[in-house]
Amino acid sequence: MGFANLEDLLAIEKEIKWEDRDLPSTLFGLLSRTANSFPNRPAVSYQILSGPKDKAETLTWSELQTKTVQAANMFRSLGVGSEDVVAYILPNANETVLTLLGGAIAGIANPINPLLDPEQIGAILRETNAKVVVTMKAFPKSDVPQKAAKA
């Protein structure tokens, strides 16, 4: 059943209470269920360069789940607990998705806009009391790692 307006949506929501729907209650549960249901289906895709020989890197749902668990385990091994912040200053990339999901599963994910000035980045890191900061290695035409180091 589709919907075209708010009234349609409200009618759909009245059919079954949210609590009675068979939905995962956590991000990890949602990721696991999707990976089990559609393991080989593409989940995320990113292409860093656009040359004729460059190809996108695509992760299936199974790969996304596996790598997300690895990221969450890494953050936990660094001492991240459920109330700790994993900040990241990253461009769009598959690694960014893994950091977001793994950080949210291990603790609290805090994306920081890489276009901000180092002073602003530093203020956010102090305000959130980030336990871990994830950024990228040096990359041509990008000053993200330098900004993160300066912050």
Tell me what each language-model feature is.
Residues R76, L100-G107, R126-E127:
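Short hydrophobic alpha-helices that are characteristic scaffold elements of the AMP-binding
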Residues G2, D22-Q47, T66:
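A short N-terminal helical cap/helix-turn-helix that marks the beginning
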Residues D8-K17:
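Short, contiguous pre-domain boundary segments
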Residues N40-A93, V97-L100, D117-G122:
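Conserved AMP-binding/adenylate-forming core of the ANL superfamily
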Residues G107-A151:
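Structural core segment of the AMP-binding/adenylate-forming
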Residues K17-W18, S50, A138-K141:
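Short histidine/acidic/glycine/proline-rich micro-motifs that form metal-
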Residues L31, L98-T99, A148:
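Aromatic/hydrophobic pocket-lining residues that form π-stacking "cages" and hydrophobic walls in ligand
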